[in-house]
Each structure stands twice: as C-alpha cells, then as structure tokens.
Design a protein with these regions (language model features):
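Membrane-proximal, proline-rich intrinsically disordered regions
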Residues: 1-47
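Conserved, well-structured interaction surfaces
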Residues: 61-140, 175-179, 191-203
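Short, surface-exposed recognition loops and adjoining beta-strand edges that mediate ligand/DNA contacts
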Residues: 4-7, 11, 40, 139-153, ...
Length: 205
C-alpha cells in the first residue's frame, strides 16, 4: 500500500523524529483496533491501563463495558494475550524509532553538528531515556508479600541500541536495572541536556 509504507528516499531526519510523537498517539498502534479492541491507542492507552492498576480508578470488572478492566483486575496479562503486549510492543517500536534517528547522525563530536541535527539528536536521546525509564518501572519485579520471583530480582528489560544486530536481538536477555540506568537512561539524559541547551521551541502563537 503506497499510503502506508515510506520508501528509503522518502525518509528524512525530519520525518524520522516527527514520527516518534506521532506514533505515541496512534490509534491501532498494535493492529488490534481493527478487530474491535478499543484499548489499542498507544501511550494514552498505556497510561489508562497502568492507572487502572492503582487504587485511584474504579474498575467495574466487566470488560464488555470497561476496556481497561483487564488491567484493573489483573486478568489476561500474560504472554498469551494481546493486552499483555500493549506496553512491550509499543515501547520497543518507539525505541527503534529513536535508535534510527541516533543511527543517522554522527554523534562522535557534538561540536560538528548544526542546530537542527543537535535538536533532532537531543530529542531522540530524551525519548529513548523516557521509554527505558517507563519499561524499567513497568517490568522490574519488586519484592512483595504475595509473590516470589528471586530469579528475576534486579532485572529490567533487554537493552536494544542502534548497533544491536538482529542475531544479538534474538538472544538478548533482561539487563540489570542498574545497567539500564547507567548505560542508557542517565547517559541519554545527559546527552539530551547538552544537545538541547540552546534549543528554543517555536512559538505557534
């Protein structure tokens, strides 16, 4: 379909970076909205889903009326269910998008970049830091009074970087939470702060 796929020569740095916030609010981001799954709308849906797991949202328990009751009642969230993949599928697609921007810009010396390149690269690092921060908070097992999982204590999620090969991605175990912070989140935020220090958002008004 020529309206759904961009050719390589149509993809620019601008379209790559602008595609990230657009994808965060995409209806049908997992492909289930067309099958009647009303919870399939990217980051806003993830926010509602996680909020439904707290005590601040009243859950009716009938998924025929409340599309987020599955998160509130902790049902059908395993690996065999589409709802369980809402966060995983979306976040790693967004991480890939950020990695694609980072891969396109030579980040070895920020001083050689023009203002546009600095802003695009800064956005990509900031987005990627946010995505990994969210994933770590979602998937890190915390000690509690109800379940035990000593085998995954201290583990977060797999780290995928621009240089990660397909073969490496297929055998990419969960990284330690500390490593995700030290190798990705904190460095990405430091780079974003440096790259965006001179950035001023345009005034639409």
């Amino acid at each position: 379909d020529p309206y759904e796929i961009a050719t390589e020569d149509q993809v620019t740095l601008e379209t790559l970076i602008e595609g990230i916030p657009a994808s965060l609010v995409q209806a049908g981001s997992e492909g289930y909205a067309s099958e009647g799954q009303a919870w399939d709308f990217a980051l806003p849906a993830i926010h509602i889903a996680t909020e439904s797991m707290t005590g601040d949202v009243a859950i009716g328990g009938n998924i025929g009326y409340d599309w987020f009751a599955q998160w509130g009642t902790n049902e059908a969230l395993g690996a065999d269910y589409a709802v369980g993949a809402l966060t995983w599928d979306n976040y790693y697609a967004w991480i890939m998008a950020a990695n694609n921007v980072i891969k396109q810009i030579d980040a070895s010396d920020f001083a050689t970049l023009d203002a546009t390149q600095k802003s695009y690269l800064g956005f990509a690092y900031a987005y990627r830091a946010m995505f990994y921060l969210d994933l770590v908070r979602l998937y890190e097992f915390k000690e509690n009074n109800y379940t035990e999982a000593p085998g995954v204590l201290g583990l977060g999620v797999p780290i995928v970087l621009p240089e990660t090969t397909e073969a490496e991605a297929k055998n990419n175990p969960r990284a330690k939470v500390d490593d995700i912070y030290d190798q990705v989140i904190f460095p990405d935020l430091d780079k974003a702060e440096e790259l965006l220090s001179g950035f001023t958002a345009p005034d639409k008004y």
